[in-house]
Curated annotation (Swiss-Prot):
This is UDP-galactose/UDP-glucose transporter 1. Keywords: Antiport, Endoplasmic reticulum, Membrane, Sugar transport, Transmembrane, Transmembrane helix, Transport. The chain crosses the membrane at residues 11-31, 49-69, 80-100, 112-132, 135-155, 206-226, 252-272, 301-317. A motif (Di-lysine motif) lies at residues 327-332. Induction: Up-regulated by stimuli that trigger unfolded protein accumulation in the ER (UPR) (e.g. DTT or tunicamycin) (at protein level). The gene is UTR1. The di-lysine motif confers endoplasmic reticulum localization for type I membrane proteins. GO terms for biological process: embryo sac development; endoplasmic reticulum unfolded protein response; nucleotide-sugar transmembrane transport; pollen development. InterPro entries: SCL35B1-4/HUT1. Essential sugar transporter required for the transport of UDP-galactose and UDP-glucose from the cytoplasm into the Golgi and the endoplasmic reticulum, to ensure quality control of protein folding. Essential for pollen development and involved in embryo sac progress. Disruption phenotype: Lethal.
Length: 332
């Protein structure tokens, strides 16, 4: 009975993680799309300062991670010192800002699809720079994802969708998403390097260090430079409290979502987390299509299916590889 009870508790915990990640990030996507397309107030002004979301997100996540460390973490656990995150903090500030800014030029579903193709630059750099040889199925995954994103980008966007964008410009929007992926790649590699050098580093330590530097860099950019948009963004929020409320909810969703991601990775591993977040992106596109009143065409849905088919196949390949490793461990 105890074994069954333990298994049932794990199922409940997994269900909690799935519902937490899905609800937090799907709603955050809705808020992100709202802030990038909606016209606020009687003067129908757009919130043009989308990069300000990064600063707000960093501040909320910094406070959240500090509270979690005080409540749950062991003090002086020998984790990475805060200053080691300075370089990853730079790319983690620039990359997501570019991804958010892309929403001025392309639709939310297009942005989600483009940002789902993270494996493409990873495999490209691995092949060209490090001479890594990948298997045929891995190349097939990349082909499906790259093909789906490329065809989606080439298909004509509806006039209704274009009218909601602040500055429609597909090439610029996709270029910003590509740069976002490149910076994310450096950020992830740096975080892995820090974790390997300081094995006792916990997830909350990483969250605190990254968001501390993110807050510092964003504050300098937003308020320290002559062209900084921080004061304009705050003034906009004062004039349009509805936008300020949406920004606060956006940040809370991000903090809650990160909490469930860390919980998933620590209890079920990174593969389970990848599966949950990948399916969440697909649902986000469906929700965006329904709620925005801009349903995708059959061809566009075909492209979406290509991308997530490739991602699903990649997850399956990782699972098979994990199974082989486990069998080898059992034999030895």
């Amino acid at each position: 009975m105890e074994v069954h009870g333990s298994g049932f508790r794990r199922i409940l915990l997994l269900a909690l993680c799935i519902s937490g990640i899905w609800s937090a990030y799907i709603y955050q996507g809705v808020l992100q799309e709202t802030l990038s397309t909606k016209r606020f107030g009687p003067d129908e002004k757009r919130f043009e300062h989308l990069a300000f979301l990064n600063l707000a997100q960093s501040v909320v996540c910094l406070i959240w991670s500090y509270i979690m460390i005080k409540l749950w973490s062991n003090a002086g656990n020998g984790g990475a010192p805060w200053w080691t995150y300075w370089s990853a903090g730079i790319t983690n500030t620039i990359g997501p800002a570019m991804g958010i800014e892309a929403l001025k030029y392309i639709s939310y579903p297009a942005q989600v699809l483009a940002k789902s193709s993270k494996m493409i630059p990873v495999m490209l750099m691995g092949t060209l720079v490090y001479g890594i040889r990948y298997t045929f199925p891995e190349y097939m995954c990349t082909f499906l994802v790259a093909g789906g994103v490329s065809i989606f980008a080439l298909l004509k966007t509806s006039s209704k969708t274009i009218s909601k964008l602040a500055h429609p410009n597909a090439p610029l929007g996709y270029a910003l998403c590509s740069l976002n992926l490149a910076f994310d790649g450096f950020t992830n590699a740096t975080q892995d390097s820090i974790a390997s050098r300081y094995p006792k580093t916990e997830a909350w330590d990483i969250m605190l260090g990254m968001n501390l530097w993110g807050t510092i860099y964003n504050m300098i950019y937003m308020f320290g430079l002559p062209q900084g948009i921080g004061f304009k963004a705050i003034q906009f929020c004062k004039l349009h409290p509805e936008a300020a409320w949406d920004i606060l909810k956006y940040c809370i969703c991000g903090a809650v979502g990160q909490n469930f991601i860390f919980m998933t990775i620590s209890n079920f591993g990174s593969l389970a987390n990848t599966t949950i977040t990948t399916t969440r992106k697909f649902v986000s596109i469906v929700v965006s299509s329904v709620m925005s009143g801009n349903p995708l065409s059959l061809k566009q849905w075909g492209c979406v299916s290509m991308v997530f088919g490739g991602l699903a196949y990649q997850i399956y390949l990782k699972w098979k590889k994990l199974q082989r490793v486990e069998k080898k461990k059992q034999k030895s």
